[in-house]
């Protein structure tokens, strides 16, 4: 049983409504506060619900979080990540573990739908040396979230300035900053991340929590992740190796791509209960990543 908590507005969130209707024991309400005496797990969608999420954490209430998927989201956003007690899936399961815990053949069928390639034929791209460093700063929404959670207290400008100076300690490569475009711009040819990685001949991408880090690795570009990130398993978290950045081997990239594909779902999978079942089977009852405050 879960309680789906929607925003206070006329419109009903279709994902929360779908989860609510997937089990007769589930509940649905529109609220910006919670009854802390009720410990039933809650479900929310989107980073704008951070004030509510903080209430969950402060009162030891488990929560499930819905947001854009890790892959297969262009041109249409058909897949959504579904995580427990975090904003992204931060752990990893290898192929043998997935095969033991769930239907691996079904995962492979889903992988083909998402990636448009058979898992057994999927060969990750290998990196080539580039001549620029691409910084993906936290968006305004993310910075507000981090501030509410007391993880940070800096502005985007301060972050960019600090990271630029840190990068300069280790390389003289050209530095490019990519501000997060709106969805229309991200889906337009020439504006998406893949196009910019090629156009700017990127040597390494530096991100905080952006899923762009995982997208870059799948395209054959090394990434460094400085915060909680679904790509942490495939990336280093320090800037000192940026001149010769780490790049995971093919097996790690393939298996992590399969795992993340198993942690994102379409609307039908939320409706029939598959999404909730998979989260419980594959995400190991995680606790919130209460990382040390970042001071710039």
Functional labels for PLM-detected ranges:
Residues 1-47, 141-142, 284-296:
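N-terminal pre-catalytic "stem/leader" segment of glycosyltransferase-like enzymes
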Residues 8-11, 48-50, 69-72, 138-142, ...:
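Short, solvent-exposed loop/turn segments at secondary-structure junctions
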Residues 24-79:
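Extended catalytic core of nucleotide-activated donor transferases of GT-like folds
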Residues 31-36, 165-223:
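Donor nucleotide-activated moiety binding/catalytic core segment of transferases
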Residues 40-41, 132, 203-204:
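Structural motif
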Residues 45, 65-68, 178, 208, ...:
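Generic beta-sheet signal
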Residues 79-130, 234-296:
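Leloir-type glycosyltransferase catalytic cores
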Residues 127-184:
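Conserved catalytic-core segment of nucleotide-activated headgroup transferases in glycan assembly
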């Amino acid at each position: 049983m879960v309680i789906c908590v929607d925003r206070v507005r006329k419109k009903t969130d279709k994902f929360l409504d779908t989860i609510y209707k997937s089990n007769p024991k589930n509940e649905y309400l529109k609220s910006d506060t919670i009854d802390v005496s009720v410990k039933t797990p809650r479900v929310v969608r989107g980073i704008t619900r951070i004030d509510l999420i903080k209430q969950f954490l402060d009162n030891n209430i488990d929560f499930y979080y819905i947001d854009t998927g890790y892959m297969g989201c262009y041109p249409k956003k058909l897949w959504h990540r579904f995580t427990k007690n975090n904003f992204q899936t931060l752990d990893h399961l290898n192929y043998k573990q997935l095969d033991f815990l769930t239907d691996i053949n079904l995962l492979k069928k889903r992988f083909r739908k998402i990636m448009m390639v058979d898992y057994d034929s999927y060969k990750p791209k290998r990196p080539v040396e580039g001549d620029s460093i691409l910084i993906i700063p936290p968006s305004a929404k993310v910075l507000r979230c981090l501030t509410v959670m007391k993880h940070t207290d800096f502005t985007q400008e301060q972050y960019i300035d600090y990271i630029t100076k840190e990068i300069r300690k280790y390389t003289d490569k050209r530095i490019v900053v990519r501000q997060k475009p709106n969805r229309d711009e991200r889906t337009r040819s020439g504006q998406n991340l893949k196009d910019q990685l090629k156009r700017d001949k990127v040597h390494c991408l530096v991100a905080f929590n952006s899923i762009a880090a995982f997208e870059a690795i799948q395209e054959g570009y090394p990434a460094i992740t400085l915060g909680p990130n679904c790509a942490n398993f495939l990336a280093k978290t320090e800037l000192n190796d940026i001149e010769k950045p780490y790049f995971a081997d093919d097996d790690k990239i393939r298996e992590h791509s399969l795992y993340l594909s198993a942690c994102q779902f379409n609307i039908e999978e939320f409706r029939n209960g598959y999404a909730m079942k998979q989260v419980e089977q594959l995400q190991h009852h995680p606790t919130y990543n209460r990382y040390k405050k970042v001071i710039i």
